[in-house]
């Protein structure tokens, strides 16, 4: 549920206790836990797609991708070893392999 | 959170590791920059030097199906502040 | 007092069933709702994306997808989407 960005440092203990159930609830947080390290398709509101390995993301939906391909209208237009995508541009993150 | 292959735990780590390196920045309005990254903040405001800007001028009028390419304009700037809300993507140099 | 249902309660009751999502732009999604958060970011499964472009309509099939709540305009519970009226 909590979609706020993680605290910048780990000096203080986390304020909230862990969620009571670790089972799959289907929440956005659970989805993201399952999809980190997997191949994903990130579509921006502009319609441009980025396909790559999801390294990590934060509460703003800022995304770090590895082995990234940029697709415009189904055509590869760029490749990046790493890419930081600013979250406000993100329309969706879709799993491109089984979670 | 899990880190896959690298020492990256949050997306901003990617930017932090690119400080003093030449980066590629994709901006709204079909603009692209390459330059040395000197500083950034949580908004993705950037300070870059030795920048080359590439502006893609998409001529949609002449090609009714859209995506009519285009004309490319380039220019250079010594030092630049980039407002974070225009940033779409930042790509650091390849890590080894 | 008449019993009132909060908007997000309605969406909560949709979890597990199909939902039609209409974005602020010319873009729509249908899929099975797995969950959502306070921002109405939504996790959908077996998703169809519908785009209306100058070149015509385009659909894309997607597996499990996290849809950013920022650009959502309307939600229609239990609907199969723009193809047939549910």
Curated annotation (Swiss-Prot), chain A:
UniProt-listed CDD domains: LSm6 (cd01726)
Coiled-coil boundaries: none
Alphabetized Gene3D superfamilies for the sequence: 2.30.30.100
Signal peptide span: none
Keywords from the named record: Cytoplasm, mRNA processing, mRNA splicing, Nucleus, Ribonucleoprotein, RNA-binding, rRNA processing, Spliceosome, tRNA processing
Keyword Protein biosynthesis set for record: no
Domain Sm: 27-99
One Gene Ontology term, aspect cellular component: U4/U6 x U5 tri-snRNP complex
Start-end of Pro residues biased regions: 1-21
One of the protein's GO biological processes: mRNA splicing, via spliceosome
Pfam families membership: LSM (PF01423)
Localization per record: Cytoplasm; Nucleus
Chief localization: cytoplasm
Region (Disordered): 1-30
This protein's record includes keyword Translocase: no
Molecular function terms, GO-annotated: RNA binding
Functional summary from the UniProt entry: Component of LSm protein complexes, which are involved in RNA processing and may function in a chaperone-like manner, facilitating the efficient association of RNA processing factors with their substrates. Component of the cytoplasmic LSM1-LSM7 complex, which is thought to be involved in mRNA degradation by activating the decapping step in the 5'-to-3' mRNA decay pathway. Component of the nuclear LSM2-LSM8 complex, which is involved in splicing of nuclear mRNAs.
Subunit structure: Component of the heptameric LSM1-LSM7 complex, which consists of LSM1, LSM2, LSM3, LSM4, LSM5, LSM6 and LSM7. Component of the heptameric LSM2-LSM8 complex, which consists of LSM2, LSM3, LSM4, LSM5, LSM6, LSM7 and LSM8. The LSm subunits form a seven-membered ring structure with a doughnut shape.
Protein family: Belongs to the snRNP Sm proteins family. SmF/LSm6 subfamily.
Record protein name field: U6 snRNA-associated Sm-like protein LSm6
């Amino acid at each position: 549920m909590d979609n706020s960005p993680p605290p910048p440092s780990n000096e203080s203990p986390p304020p909230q206790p862990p969620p009571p159930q670790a089972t799959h609830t289907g929440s956005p947080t659970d989805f993201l836990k399952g999809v980190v390290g997997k191949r994903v398709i990130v579509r921006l509101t502009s319609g441009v797609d980025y396909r790559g390995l999801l390294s990590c993301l934060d509460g703003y939906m800022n995304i770090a991708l590895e082995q990234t391909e940029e697709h415009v209208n189904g055509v590869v237009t760029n490749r990046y070893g790493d890419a930081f995508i600013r979250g406000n541009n993100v329309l969706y993150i879709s799993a491109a392999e089984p979670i | 959170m899990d880190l896959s292959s690298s020492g990256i735990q949050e997306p901003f780590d990617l930017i932090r590791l690119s400080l003093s390196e030449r980066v590629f920045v994709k901006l709204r309005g079909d603009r692209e920059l390459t330059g040395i990254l000197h500083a950034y903040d949580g908004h993705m405001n950037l300070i870059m030097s030795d920048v080359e800007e590439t502006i893609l001028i998409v001529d949609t009028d002449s090609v009714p199906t859209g995506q009519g390419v285009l004309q490319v304009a380039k220019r250079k700037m010594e030092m630049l502040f980039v407002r974070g809300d225009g940033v779409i993507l930042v790509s650091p140099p390849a890590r080894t | 007092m008449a019993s009132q249902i909060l908007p997000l309660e309605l969406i909560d009751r949709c979890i597990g069933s199909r939902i039609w999502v209409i974005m602020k732009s010319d873009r729509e999604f249908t899929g099975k709702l797995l969950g959502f958060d306070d921002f109405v970011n939504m996790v959908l499964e077996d998703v169809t994306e519908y785009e209306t472009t100058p070149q015509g309509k385009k659909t894309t099939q997607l597996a499990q997808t996290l849809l950013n709540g920022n650009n959502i305009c309307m939600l229609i519970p239990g609907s199969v989407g723009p193809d047939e009226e549910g």
